[in-house]
């Protein structure tokens, strides 16, 4: 989207949303979809969303009186062999007087519509904010400074400065989290924007108290970042991230079981309770810097004291006995069982090593569909689905009770 310097006064409409791209979108856009990314129901047939705050996405370019609109339900489907399969609904935000329900007054009752307004908004007025042209602009990430939707809904947290190459960076794309190699915009963020991101991230973290989820791309990044900042992602062996276990030198913690299971081993979670935080390591350690041919080596010496009256004292002692210089060993209760000896009885029909003859399974014929149109999506549904980001659940790894401190990610 080319940008140019203004030469005097102009009758062109003012920009609506300050999004950090070369030129923000203008009022009266010819698009037909929401400016914002969707919130998505976690289950089929979820009730309509309720919000902790006003329910209006943050937009610093609008006056308080203009902060009102509606959330509209969007039914979603996936193509499958047997036809089309419904998936949980998505809900999109539109300002009053725009979008599919542009002819409604604020508060008019209609199925699949939830009206929202900020305190002090003039709901009798209609907005001239227009809608988005998806061929020109990406979706704008959702931010709720006063509280987001209830726990029946989710949305993906996207940094405001993340954009897509080859298209306008006026709006950060929800799809960018599926491609971490895409370059983010290099514009500076204001302190207020950083604070807003922190608040939004906290809201999402609060909604996901039952357990965080990490994508495969994020896990790969965790395992290959700078060595001193690495963490062991789910499904990884310790040696994949920090190298083979040793004895008597650095890397001497972990027996064979811990190395194989990584953070699944409960002993990891236990011992991480004793590991110093970054600040403790920096300010409470004995730090010894040493210049070497390959660079500056920093040695941190820190002592954690576990009182003898600690309820877990014996467990910590046991874990240290097992895992310090533990390479080549396993816990006693995890020793592999010896294989049972082969039977010396003569082979009979019952115990013969020859495989039994299997019955041939009948091939299932695909069911005929009375309505062939039902097998494919309609053109409207194809267009709607094309607008949706993160339709499918991303390939994620259940993190469970995190073995990492909140400052480690």
Swiss-Prot record:
Biased composition range(s): Low complexity: 15-31, 164-179
Disulfide connectivity for this sequence is 320-323
Q: Which GO terms describe its molecular function?
A: RNA binding
Q: Where is the CoV N NTD domain?
A: 31-156
Taxonomically, which superkingdom? Answer: Viruses
SUPFAM superfamilies, per the entry: Coronavirus RNA-binding domain, Nucleocapsid protein dimerization domain
Protein family according to the UniProt entry? Belongs to the gammacoronavirus nucleocapsid protein family.
Query: Could you tell me what this protein is called?
Result: Nucleoprotein
């Amino acid at each position: 989207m080319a940008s140019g310097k203004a030469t005097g006064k102009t009758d062109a409409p003012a920009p609506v949303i300050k999004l950090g791209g070369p030129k923000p979108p203008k009022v009266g856009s010819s698009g037909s979809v929401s400016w914002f990314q969707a919130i998505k129901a976690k289950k089929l047939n979820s009730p309509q969303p309720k919000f902790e705050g006003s329910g209006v996405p943050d937009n610093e370019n609008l006056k308080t009186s203009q902060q009102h609109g509606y959330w509209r339900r969007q039914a979603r489907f996936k193509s499958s062999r047997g036809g089309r399969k419904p998936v949980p609904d998505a809900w999109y935000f539109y300002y009053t007087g725009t979008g599919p329900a542009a002819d409604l007054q604020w508060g008019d009752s209609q199925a699949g519509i939830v009206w929202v307004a900020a305190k002090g908004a003039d709901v009798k007025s209609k907005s001239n904010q227009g809608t988005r042209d998806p061929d020109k602009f990406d979706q704008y990430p959702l931010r709720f400074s006063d509280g987001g939707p209830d726990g029946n809904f989710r949305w993906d947290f996207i940094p405001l400065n993340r954009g897509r190459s080859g298209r306008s960076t006026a709006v950060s794309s929800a799809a960018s989290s599926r491609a971490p190699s895409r370059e983010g915009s290099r514009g500076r963020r204001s302190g207020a924007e950083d604070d807003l991101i922190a608040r939004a991230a906290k809201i999402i973290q609060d909604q996901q108290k039952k357990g965080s989820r990490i994508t495969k791309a994020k896990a790969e990044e965790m395992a290959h970042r700078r060595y001193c900042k690495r963490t062991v992602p789910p499904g990884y062996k310790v040696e994949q991230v920090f190298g083979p276990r040793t004895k008597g030198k650095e890397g001497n913690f972990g027996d064979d079981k811990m190395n194989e299971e990584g953070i699944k081993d409960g002993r990891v979670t236990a011992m991480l309770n004793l590991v110093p935080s970054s600040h403790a390591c920096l300010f409470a350690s004995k730090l010894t810097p040493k210049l070497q041919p390959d660079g500056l080596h920093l040695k941190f010496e820190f002592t954690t004291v576990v009182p003898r009256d600690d309820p877990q004292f014996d467990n910590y002692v046991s874990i240290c006995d097992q895992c310090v210089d533990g390479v080549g060993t396993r816990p006693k209760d995890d020793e592999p069982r010896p294989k049972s000896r082969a039977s010396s009885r003569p082979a009979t029909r019952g115990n013969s090593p020859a495989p039994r003859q299997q019955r041939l399974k009948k091939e299932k014929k695909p069911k005929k569909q009375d309505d062939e149109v039902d097998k494919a999506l309609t053109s409207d549904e194809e267009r709607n689905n094309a607008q949706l980001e993160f339709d499918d659940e991303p390939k994620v790894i259940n993190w469970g009770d995190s073995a990492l401190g909140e400052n480690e990610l």
